[in-house]
């Protein structure tokens, strides 16, 4: 399955929640009507969604939120299942530990897509070495920095200013003046993806 490159608001409207695919520079309400699905007739009434349909929607929601395709998403699920602890919570922690997501959480990119582009354009260093694989998993204590030649990019400074005004998550520590940050730990489940029911994703893959 190819990566979706169409309107981002359409995906958020389809899932009925903000997938954080757009920059927070403007309120999402001014861009997307989340209470209506995309299409000519919008949300239909009276039709009950099956359990399978609900489970599939939750999986699609997670995949779209983190910008991950099916093959890679399944790999994360298999790894989450292999590890100790709650499979659904571990799955979300793995997604949160992706390099592109951590770059986004640190405020270097205003969206995950923008953060992924910074990684693919070799603007990011991980522990002092250039990192250009968005799916790399970051570990507690890892240091992420903007490469020297990329520090003049205006969009990075704008994103950092925006992140500072909104507030950074507690599991990252960022020195905006040096454009460097530390991944302190994987986030607690209660702090991320609050509109996702990951247990339905586990049920879907367990069918």
From Swiss-Prot:
GO terms for cellular component: small ribosomal subunit. Signal peptide: none annotated. The keyword RNA-binding applies. The keyword Ribosomal protein applies. Residues 31-51 are annotated as: Disordered. PANTHER family: 30S 40S RIBOSOMAL PROTEIN, SMALL RIBOSOMAL SUBUNIT PROTEIN US4M. One of the primary rRNA binding proteins, it binds directly to 16S rRNA where it nucleates assembly of the body of the 30S subunit. Belongs to the universal ribosomal protein uS4 family. This is Small ribosomal subunit protein uS4. The lineage of its organism: Bacteria, Pseudomonadati, Pseudomonadota, Betaproteobacteria, Burkholderiales.
């Amino acid at each position: 399955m190819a990566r979706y490159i169409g309107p981002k608001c359409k995906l958020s409207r389809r899932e009925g929640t903000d997938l954080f695919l757009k920059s927070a520079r403007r309120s999402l309400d001014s861009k997307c009507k989340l209470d209506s699905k995309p299409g000519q007739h919008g949300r239909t009434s009276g039709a009950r969604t099956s359990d399978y349909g609900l489970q599939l929607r939750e999986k699609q929601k997670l995949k779209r939120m983190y910008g991950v395709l099916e093959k890679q998403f399944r790999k994360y699920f298999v790894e989450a299942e292999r590890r100790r602890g709650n499979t659904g919570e571990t799955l979300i922690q793995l997604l949160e530990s992706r390099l592109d997501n951590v770059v986004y959480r640190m405020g270097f990119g205003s969206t995950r897509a923008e953060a992924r582009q910074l990684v693919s354009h070799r603007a990011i260093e991980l522990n002092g070495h250039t990192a250009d694989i968005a799916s790399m998993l970051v570990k507690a204590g890892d240091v992420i920095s903007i490469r020297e030649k990329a520090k003049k990019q205006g969009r990075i400074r704008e994103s950092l200013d925006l992140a500072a005004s909104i507030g950074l998550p507690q599991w990252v520590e960022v020195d905006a003046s040096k454009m460097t940050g530390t991944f302190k730990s994987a986030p607690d489940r209660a702090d991320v993806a609050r509109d996702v029911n990951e247990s339905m994703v586990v049920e879907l893959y367990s069918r």
